[in-house]
């Protein structure tokens, strides 16, 4: 039986959208889909090949991010005016950052957070690295984990077709909780092990079709191709997730 942790926050506390000092990211996906390596790469740990036979439990990590880092991340791509080639889809999804999600970032970092930025200088980012979810039923613990999340990263292994297919079940469960709790929790899809070109079984075209059918778009920073081993797009992935959290919280505050 697998053991899964929760963030430990009380659901009776203030709504997550009013927490301006922390962001909670849950990383989900099949076992051995590269979740742990992705998280540890972002935390600055050295890359290690996972032992497929090793039993593991869910882990909760912390990392402090300066709020200015998010502002600089936005301004970098705003000034360049180009969407980074995160997914190998640049030719099909070319355009400026303003064309694809300009209002999305502009409102968040310039308008919505103008006063917020003056009150805080850093964000405590809590990353919850889960083990494989039981998709056959929705447990109370799984519901709690999703409800406590500010955003969810769904990982699949570019060399394992079944890990991509599993995402549909994960997304259905997350959407169910989102509707039930009336929460707009951002979901970002991450393809791991993109450095293993010779072993890759999932083509860019297949990924694009799959994520578009589920309502996701690389142009909206919904999808990233990553390599934990060579630290490809890892930092960009997590910064984009944090930007999405800022917007989600801002939108939620306006409704309350």
From Swiss-Prot:
The keyword ATP-binding applies. The keyword Nucleotide-binding applies. CDD domains: Ras_like_GTPase. Keywords: ATP-binding, Nucleotide-binding. GO terms for biological process: intracellular protein transport. One of its GO terms (cellular component) is endomembrane system. It holds the Pfam family Ras. GO terms for molecular function: ATP binding; GTP binding; GTPase activity. ATP binds at residues 29-36. InterPro entries: P-loop_NTPase, Small_GTPase. This is Uncharacterized protein YHR022C. It comes from Saccharomyces cerevisiae (strain ATCC 204508 / S288c) (Baker's yeast).
